[in-house]
Amino acid sequence: MAEAGPISTITIAFSSFVGVILGGILSDRWVQKNIRGRVYTGAIGLGLTVPALMLLGFGSSFVAVIGAGLLFGIGFGIFDANNMPILCQFVSAKHRGTAYGIMNMTGVFAGAAVTQLLGKWTDGGSLGEGFAMLSIIVLIALALQLYFLRPKTDNME
């Protein structure tokens, strides 16, 4: 554990930074050609977390775990870099603080629920399968994002 903590933290932090930069650049360019470019960019990021969760769940080697961390970090970075820009496509400036606060709080509640689930799966000896099952939830979120998020403008006034 003395090695696992720093290695996983550095891997995810570095790859998230890469994802944020790549996701921001891609999104800013894509939205100039397609109004849903930010949504698609966020979907790509979210999509990268699916194989990461599968690798975390079923990977049994150091390389698999590092690969999962890299995929998750890049994917989450791409996804996270686009949350506020996507929000701006749907919510006017006068309500963005409230909307972003609600969005963040929803994430905190979801994180708390997932932490509780992971604890139960750990106690039951099925943490790996639990991580893999989380990929199903991510796939559902990805499908919902692609189906429902249809912006009409890049910046709602």
Report residues per predicted region.
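A membrane-interface helix-boundary motif in multi-pass transporters
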Residues: 37-40, 119-137
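Cytoplasmic membrane-interface "Motif A"-like loop-to-helix N-cap segments
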Residues: 28-45
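Multi-pass alpha-helical transporter architecture, strongest
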Residues: 52-58, 133-157
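Intracellular juxtamembrane helix-capping segments at the cytosolic ends
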Residues: 78-91
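Hydrophobic core of transmembrane alpha-helices in multi-pass small-molecule transporters
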Residues: 62-78
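Cytoplasmic loop-to-transmembrane helix junctions
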Residues: 4-7, 37, 95-102
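Transmembrane alpha-helices of Major Facilitator/SLC transporters
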Residues: 5-29
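A late C-terminal transmembrane helix in Major Facilitator Superfamily
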Residues: 20, 88-125
